[in-house]
């Protein structure tokens, strides 16, 4: 993961992508989606077993990552894609995904 710099706003999102009609294994599709989002400037991400956590200075960067993921999965021949996106845009103070995790493990 790339190091974060201080900034005014941080948007954190939980994103998962699911190709439909491609069989039971989605690993290759998720891998291709991750390759696509790794190229998005200003985006940090953390892979978890059920979703990927995205972090950026603005929501538009997160949406670019979602779009890039869909394009990557389409390029592999998926005819239908379902995705889930949940965004937390905190405006009152700087909180990163690591801060949020640390605050509940103290």
Where are these regions (language model features)?
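Charge-rich, low-complexity N-terminal segments
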Residues: 2-106
């Amino acid at each position: 993961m790339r190091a974060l710099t201080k900034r005014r706003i941080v948007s954190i999102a939980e994103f998962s992508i699911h190709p439909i009609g491609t069989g039971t294994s989605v690993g290759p599709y998720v891998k291709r989606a991750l390759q696509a989002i790794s190229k998005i400037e200003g985006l940090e991400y953390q892979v978890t077993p059920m979703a990927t956590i995205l972090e950026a200075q603005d929501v538009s960067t997160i949406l670019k990552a979602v779009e890039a993921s869909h394009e990557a999965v389409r390029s592999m021949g998926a005819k239908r894609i379902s995705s889930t996106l949940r965004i937390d845009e905190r405006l009152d103070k700087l909180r990163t995904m690591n801060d949020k995790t640390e605050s509940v493990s103290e």
